[in-house]
């Protein structure tokens, strides 16, 4: 279940992770965060300036104020660029959303709400700041703080050593964001490690929450029914389509579990399997490294991951927990090095597997995809060879599929491997074919041979780089990280057995001693 909005900017290569600055003292439960600042009015527009249909104010040319540089990231609805303020020379990130992609009223409302929420939350140290919003005839442009310090997990991995105390400091910053959001009537709904970036490469850089595209305003006791979020981090009540802001606490608890162990608490070979595990609620505290982790840490995780949302700790109660406090009980001894290794693998593995599954889909016989080819043709109404979001939106109901708007967007994001905003034939097949067919031995062999260009029986670093770059799937550093993690015999290349283990999710390095539950 992917999130349905575009990603925020990703920064340059990461530096060793910082020891984050402490958050406000947890005993200040009733602390009032700074009042939301009113957005700075845009410069006066010409008398005949047209009104923007998204922001509802006179259109402005963002390029008159900012110089656009390189692309930083790309998502379903837009592209994020590095921009420079012409008058001051200061650098920012600009999320540019093409208005032609905002085809429905809900799309427009989502962008408006994202702008409103980011302005509303302005002033918090751990929330990325929106500096301005501009609309012209082609796009809505959101100017934001530039986060150049890298993703949360990346910096931990780069450092290579880590302690419970460091995990507690990071968790404090994450929960402080939740506390501020909830106290100001905002429900984030998509808390996950990828949505936390460090502002700078310095050791004391603050951690910043980004991407409020799924966030909503809420009142105490209000419940929601739409299925949103990301599979590993989604709360059980969200899957039951009756949930409130307590779901943010669950997501933060999942992040804390991963910070301490390197793997998610609810793990399976498919998204449906993950959802079943979430609903069952069994949390593994017996496998390594949990026996050596403090009781205080385990106590907090358990209280954040209670199945009944009413029994979960509130953000204020978490900040007062003895383990997480700045002067609290979290020990400073390093966590087992395998935690870093497993975290690295969890972050990197899916990219290679997604490409491999697409390769498998491209080699399936007509017999194996009976019905799927015709379904693709019926959805591809303009015969372009690709399916757009609009074609999915209009075509699925005609096929008898009852699916919500948010689920349609999630399907698009999950299936769109190369991130170009459309689903091609192979992407469609790999997303809709039952996994047991994709994992047949002969299909995996074909995928392996696709990467093994010289038929040596091994996939080398160069072969992997060549194949993945065709799909724009990561930089050299990430590619080398992937091969290092899949290469369990450490000979610098991937043999067929290692490739099969990766495809079938049986790699013991990912989930040691974890029993199959499905």
From Swiss-Prot:
GO terms for biological process, alphabetical: intracellular signal transduction
EC number from the UniProt entry: 2.7.11.1
Amino-acid positions noted as binding Ca(2+) 3 in the UniProt annotation, renumbered to this chain: 452, 454, 456, 458, 463
Catalysed reaction, written as an equation: L-seryl-[protein] + ATP = O-phospho-L-seryl-[protein] + ADP + H(+); L-threonyl-[protein] + ATP = O-phospho-L-threonyl-[protein] + ADP + H(+)
Pfam families xrefs: EF-hand_7, Pkinase
Activity-regulation annotation: Activated by calcium. Autophosphorylation may play an important role in the regulation of the kinase activity.
Molecular function as annotated in GO: ATP binding; calcium ion binding; calcium-dependent protein serine/threonine kinase activity; calcium/calmodulin-dependent protein kinase activity; calmodulin binding; protein serine kinase activity
CDD domains: EFh, STKc_CAMK
UniProt-annotated catalytic positions: 190
GO CC, alphabetical: cytoplasm; membrane; nucleus
Positions that bind Ca(2+) 2: 416, 418, 420, 422, 427
Feature: compositional bias, Low complexity: 26-35
Annotated tissue distribution: Expressed in roots and leaf blades.
InterPro entries, per database record: CDPK_Ser/Thr_kinases, EF-hand-dom_pair, EF_Hand_1_Ca_BS, EF_hand_dom, Kinase-like_dom_sf, Prot_kinase_dom, Protein_kinase_ATP_BS, Ser/Thr_kinase_AS
Keyword Transmembrane helix attached: no
Subcellular locations according to the entry: Membrane
Family label: Belongs to the protein kinase superfamily. Ser/Thr protein kinase family. CDPK subfamily.
Protein name, as recorded: Calcium-dependent protein kinase 1
Organism from which the protein derives: Oryza sativa subsp. japonica (Rice)
Lineage, broadest ranks: Eukaryota, Viridiplantae, Streptophyta, Embryophyta, Tracheophyta
């Amino acid at each position: 279940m992917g999130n349905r909005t575009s990603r925020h900017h990703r920064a340059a290569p990461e530096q060793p992770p910082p020891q984050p600055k402490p958050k406000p003292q947890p005993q200040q439960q009733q602390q009032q965060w700074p009042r939301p600042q009113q957005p700075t009015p845009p410069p006066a527009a010409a008398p005949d300036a047209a009104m923007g249909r998204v922001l509802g104010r006179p259109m402005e040319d963002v390029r008159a104020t900012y110089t656009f540089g390189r692309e930083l990231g790309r998502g379903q609805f837009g592209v994020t660029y590095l921009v420079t303020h012409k008058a001051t020379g200061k650098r920012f990130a600009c999320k540019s959303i093409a208005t032609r992609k905002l085809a429905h009223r809900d799309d427009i409302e989502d962008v408006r709400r994202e702008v409103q929420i980011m302005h509303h939350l302005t002033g918090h140290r751990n929330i990325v700041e929106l500096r301005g919003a501009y609309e012209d005839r082609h796009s809505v442009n959101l100017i934001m703080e530039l986060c150049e310090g890298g993703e949360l997990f990346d910096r931990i991995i780069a450092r290579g050593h880590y302690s419970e105390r460091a995990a507690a400091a990071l968790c404090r910053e994450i929960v402080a964001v939740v506390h501020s959001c909830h106290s100001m009537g905002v429900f984030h709904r998509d808390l996950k490690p990828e949505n936390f970036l460090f502002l700078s490469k310095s050791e004391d850089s603050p951690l910043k929450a980004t991407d409020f595209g799924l966030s909503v305003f809420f009142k105490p006791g209000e419940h929601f029914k739409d299925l949103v979020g990301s599979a590993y981090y989604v709360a059980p009540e969200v899957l039951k389509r009756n949930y409130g802001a307590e779901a943010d606490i669950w997501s933060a608890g999942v992040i804390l579990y991963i910070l301490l162990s390197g793997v998610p608490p609810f793990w399976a070979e498919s998204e449906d399997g993950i959802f079943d595990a979430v609903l069952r609620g069994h949390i593994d505290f017996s496998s390594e490294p949990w026996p050596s982790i403090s009781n205080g840490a385990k106590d907090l995780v358990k209280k954040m991951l209670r199945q009944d949302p009413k029994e979960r700790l509130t953000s204020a109660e978490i900040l007062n927990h003895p383990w997480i406090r700045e002067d609290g009980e979290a020990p400073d001894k390093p966590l087992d090095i395998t935690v870093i290794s497993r975290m690295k693998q969890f972050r990197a593995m899916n990219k290679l597997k997604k490409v491999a599954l697409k390769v498998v889909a491209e080699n399936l016989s007509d017999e194996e995809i009976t019905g799927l080819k015709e379904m693709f043709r019926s959805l591809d109404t303009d015969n372009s060879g690709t399916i757009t979001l609009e074609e999915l939106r209009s075509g699925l109901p005609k096929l008898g599929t009852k699916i919500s708007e948010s689920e349609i967007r999630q399907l698009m994001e999950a299936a769109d491997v190369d991130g170009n905003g459309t689903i091609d034939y192979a992407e469609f097949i790999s997303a809709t074919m039952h996994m047991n067919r994709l994992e047949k031995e002969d299909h995996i062999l074909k995928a392996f041979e696709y990467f093994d260009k010289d038929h040596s029986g091994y996939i080398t670093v160069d072969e992997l780089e060549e194949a993945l770059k065709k799909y724009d799937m990561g930089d050299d550093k990430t590619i080398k990280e992937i091969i290092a993690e899949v290469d369990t015999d450490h000979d610098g290349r991937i043999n067929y057995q290692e490739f099969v283990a990766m495809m079938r999710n049986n790699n013991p390095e990912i989930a040691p001693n974890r029993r199959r539950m499905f």
